[in-house]
Amino acid sequence: MNNKFLSLLAVCFLVFSCKSEDKKTEENVESTETNAVKKMLVQMDVIQTTANNYAVYYTEDNTINFTTEYVIWNEVKPSPNVQTLDFSFPESAYPTHVRFDLGNNPQTDDVVLNKFKLSYGDKSLEAKGSDFFNYFLKNDSIATEIDQAKGSIKFLKKKGSKAVPFFYPNEVMMLEIAKLMK
């Protein structure tokens, strides 16, 4: 009788201890998912045949007062092929507006933007280069050529011009960023 009782007690102990471990594992997975760090990431697919430095400026105060305090730089290596540039925002950043600066090298060649993507957590906005001006204001000091067939935009460098090709967000981009950040 004692042996049967001890055996039954051991089986109960095993069954209940295994269930609590499964429950703890499920809780840990849920906790890890909710504690996953969300941060903004901007990606650009570009063709740049001269060395350059690109920047993404951002603000967190619903203005377009961009400063060097809120900027992410990315070195662009010269290549005739498409390269993807990643601009990873700080974890604490909560951008409301972004500005693209496509190079600070006055000796640069034309720049081709095939696409760009903004993502935050599991949400993203991806657009072809040819749709660039659906999201950004045109900068009259920079000439552009849009190739609808390729879905790209080319930013043309004027000889002797020292103008930096920078582009402010329009209302559509501001709304899209707000959707991403919710």
Describe the residue ranges of each PLM region.
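Sec-dependent signal peptide recognition
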Residues: 2-9
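Short acidic/polar inter-strand loop motif in beta-rich domains
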Residues: 104-112, 117-125
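Noncatalytic modules at the cell exterior or secretory-pathway interfaces
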Residues: 37-43, 90-100, 149-151
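Bacterial signal peptide processing site
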Residues: 19-22
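Extracellular beta-strand ligand-recognition surfaces/modules
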Residues: 82-108
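C-terminal motif of bacterial Sec signal peptides marking the signal peptidase cleavage site
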Residues: 14-17
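Extracellular carbohydrate recognition and processing domains
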Residues: 63-91, 135-137, 144-147
